[in-house]
């Protein structure tokens, strides 16, 4: 099944800004998160949304996606140890230039130590876990050297022999007709798969591969202040090295589950708190939830809807360095929808005592609105 366009998944245009991408992701992730949405297919939808956001939120990945789409740009171009155009449709021309310009020196020793492959693990964190950090234990499947043959691939008591077809070089010379004439190309030996070794008696555990897949438990300390999409490198916890080379690394990518009340922007947290018409008019003190606990907030008289109050130090700990972000409290004045006769009479009396006037700032707004209606 073909993948959907990432921009279509997030419901945004291809010219969308980074802020628009983030807002679209937050909206959709809240709607389809499996912990919130129990409908069938919500989990797959959430994975699709997360994948699209991961690709489009990173400028480099987005540029690559815009150019190549879902196709791997390295596919068919030989993303092997040699890099560049080491394989695929262009290998013939590279071999030609190797022949004429001494490219044979690029051939690697098949028995040289090589670093193991890096691994990636996606860890889902609750909103507060990302803020305060946690100690976690994860399980990852990875290739390790076989304990029976110690990575040689040979049956215990025997040793691999030099490949009789390539002489232990891992490659063979193949003659080829080209526009430049008849040349000799180097090809990976198909008998030893480039290892330069021939195993007569294979290890009964790994069947000659020298490696087996195991599940490894790894303890990971998630630092306080990580954000959605960030990653952490765990050195040496990737796949085992080849020919005695060092292990690869493990990259833990964090996916933060959105909170239904708090919203995060960098190290600051934003919340919207409702207050009554009376509280806004006369002033009050209210309790406001923060990730650090309940805080008492003074609401001055005459507070307007949309007014923002800052609670310093009640945000997210800085991931690098000291200090903590702030929490921004945005108040929303709730106008009563149902009033009894007595309440209506009180408001009418209030309006008559004030002459139903508005202050200068509001008056200026109404003047502008009147001019807009008149077309001035």
Curated annotation (Swiss-Prot):
Its main location: cytoplasm. The J domain is necessary and sufficient to stimulate DnaK ATPase activity. Zinc center 1 plays an important role in the autonomous, DnaK-independent chaperone activity of DnaJ. Zinc center 2 is essential for interaction with DnaK and for DnaJ activity. The lineage of its organism: Bacteria, Bacillati, Bacillota, Bacilli, Bacillales. GO terms for biological process: chaperone cofactor-dependent protein refolding; DNA replication; protein refolding; response to heat. It comes from Listeria monocytogenes serotype 4a (strain HCC23). Binds 2 Zn(2+) ions per monomer. One of its GO terms (molecular function) is ATP binding. This is Chaperone protein DnaJ. Participates actively in the response to hyperosmotic and heat shock by preventing the aggregation of stress-denatured proteins and by disaggregating proteins, also in an autonomous, DnaK-independent fashion. Unfolded proteins bind initially to DnaJ; upon interaction with the DnaJ-bound protein, DnaK hydrolyzes its bound ATP, resulting in the formation of a stable complex. GrpE releases ADP from DnaK; ATP binding to DnaK triggers the release of the substrate protein, thus completing the reaction cycle. Residues 5-69 form the J domain. Pfam families: DnaJ, DnaJ_C, DnaJ_CXXCXGXG. CXXCXGXG motif repeats lie at residues 146-153, 163-170, 189-196, 203-210. Keywords: Chaperone, Cytoplasm, DNA replication, Metal-binding, Repeat, Stress response, Zinc, Zinc-finger. It is found in: Cytoplasm. HAMAP family: DnaJ. Its cofactor is Zn(2+). A zinc finger (CR-type) spans 133-215. Zn(2+) 1 binds at residues 146, 149, 203, 206. Homodimer. The keyword Hydrolase does not apply. The gene is dnaJ. InterPro entries: DnaJ (IPR012724), DnaJ_C (IPR002939), DnaJ_domain (IPR001623), DnaJ_domain_CS (IPR018253), HSP40/DnaJ_pept-bd (IPR008971), HSP_DnaJ_Cys-rich_dom (IPR001305), HSP_DnaJ_Cys-rich_dom_sf (IPR036410), J_dom_sf (IPR036869). Belongs to the DnaJ family.
């Amino acid at each position: 099944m073909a993948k959907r366009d990432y921009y279509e998944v997030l419901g945004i245009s291809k010219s969308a800004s980074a802020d628009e991408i983030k807002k679209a992701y937050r909206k959709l992730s809240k709607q389809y998160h499996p912990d919130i949405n129990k409908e069938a297919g919500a989990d797959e939808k959430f994975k699709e949304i997360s994948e699209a956001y991961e690709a489009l939120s990173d400028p480099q990945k987005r540029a690559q996606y815009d150019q190549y789409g879902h196709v791997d740009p390295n596919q068919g171009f030989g993303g092997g140890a040699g890099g560049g155009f080491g394989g695929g449709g262009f290998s013939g021309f590279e071999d030609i230039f190797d022949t004429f310009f001494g490219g044979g020196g690029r051939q690697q020793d098949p028995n040289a130590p090589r670093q193991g492959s890096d691994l990636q693990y996606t860890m889902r964190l609750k909103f507060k876990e990302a803020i305060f950090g946690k100690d976690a234990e994860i399980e990852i499947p990875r290739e390790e050297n076989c304990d029976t043959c110690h990575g040689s691939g040979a049956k215990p008591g025997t040793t691999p022999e030099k490949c009789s077809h390539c002489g232990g070089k891992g490659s063979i010379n193949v003659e080829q007709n080209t526009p430049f004439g008849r040349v000799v190309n180097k090809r990976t030996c198909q008998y030893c798969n480039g290892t330069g070794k021939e195993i007569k008696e294979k290890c009964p555990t790994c069947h000659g591969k020298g490696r087996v897949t195991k599940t490894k438990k790894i303890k990971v300390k998630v630092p306080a202040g990580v954000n959605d999409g960030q990653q952490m490198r765990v050195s040496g916890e990737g796949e085992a090295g080849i020919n005695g080379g060092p292990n690869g690394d493990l990259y833990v990518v964090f996916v933060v589950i959105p909170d239904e009340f708090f919203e995060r922007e960098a190290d600051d947290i934003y919340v919207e708190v409702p207050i009554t018409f009376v509280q806004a008019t006369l002033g009050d003190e209210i309790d406001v939830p923060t990730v650090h606990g309940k805080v008492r907030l003074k609401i001055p008289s005459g507070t307007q809807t949309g007014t923002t109050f800052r609670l310093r130090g009640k945000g997210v700990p800085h991931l690098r360095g000291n200090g903590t972000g702030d929490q921004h409290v945005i108040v929303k004045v709730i106008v009563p929808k149902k009033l009894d006769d007595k309440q209506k009479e009180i408001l009418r009396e209030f309006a008559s005592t004030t002459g139903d006037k508005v202050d200068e700032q509001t008056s200026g707004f109404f003047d502008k609105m009147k001019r807009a209606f008149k077309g001035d």
